[in-house]
Amino acid sequence: MKRILPLLIASVVSVALLAQNSFYIYKLDGSIEQYLVDEVERISFEAPEVDPDQPIEPDQPIEPEQPIEPEPQVAVLTFEDDDAKFPAYTLDYCGVDVEKWSDIIPAADQQYYGGSTLIYADWGNPDGAPYTWTDAGNTGLTHTFPYNWGTYDFAGGGMVISNHYVSLEELENVGTGGMYNYQLSILGEQTDNTFAFAYCDSKVNSDAKIELAFEDGVARQLNKMKVVMGALPIYSIINGSDFSEAYDDDDYLKLVITGYAEDGSTQQVEIMLADGQNPETWVVDWTEVDLSSLGKVTKIAFYLDEAQQISYDGGNTIYYKTPIYFAIDDLEVKL
């Protein structure tokens, strides 16, 4: 009479047919059992009995599944046409339709004071409209020239889109009389790279700060950006200019970035752009700056601090002597 062969599932490794009339059962304890096929009607696999009041102890500890953290979403302000996502707008004061970043770059031969109507159209006009740009659809940051000296022009400070380069040799050839023809330039060979080029008001403690703000007013984390000195301050640090002297060991040029939280509190990041007459300290190439210590901000403000200062009215108003220009690029925002 054939029998039913009950086997505990947890005790069996495998069942192998050895020949047409027999098979082996390999068990976890290392034993092997042989049966004739003719003796067995069927094999019945059974689960072991479990005491419902006794918790099951697993052979290996079961690690709880860790939640998968989503990758943080970031957006980068590159100022490149391929990355422009903002809706088209018009700068009415100069009749320029803006669909991409390069639409608001002053021409290379119009970098001097008063040269481009994009950034000098409203000189002396208190009701004039300011140069403005937006990165809507990407980082959400926007910038507008500050109102200063009775105008919204670049002479009062601001951040303009540029892609202009100049060599130090060319600046030395034209000297202080011609260097402002390269006012919106950084040092280097001409490339297709586009960036934001800034001028800070030369008045010490000026209220006309250069600001980048989130258009919707929501605070976000700024991760990092790149920064470099403008070509004119580098030339002036080395050679002096009509208004400044070549740097001594005690001179410096420092960029200060202030972040404003939703509650109005502030944090600052300082970047030494030039420390004395030591070229190794000069930020003449694009340099990455960590902005994470600012925390979540609704806006940031830039200003430059410099050792060389002068007063023309008996000390009532103090001005920086070195041309204070810098550029930024690749500003990363955590969304």
Q: For each predicted feature, which ranges?
A:
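Bacterial Sec-dependent N-terminal signal peptides
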Residues: 1-24, 61-68
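Short N-terminal segments immediately surrounding and downstream of signal-peptide cleavage
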Residues: 21-36, 78-83
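N-terminal targeting signals for Sec/Tat export/insertion, comprising classic cleavable signal peptides
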Residues: 27-49, 90-99
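Ser/Thr/Gly/Pro-rich low-complexity, disordered linker/stalk segments of secreted
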Residues: 48-71
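N-terminal targeting leaders for non-cytosolic proteins
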Residues: 71-208, 217
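Terminal, low-complexity interaction segments
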Residues: 77-81, 249-335
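Extended extracellular/luminal ectodomain segments enriched in beta-structured repeat modules
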Residues: 217-224, 296-297
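Short coil-to-beta strand junction motifs in C2/discoidin
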Residues: 236-255
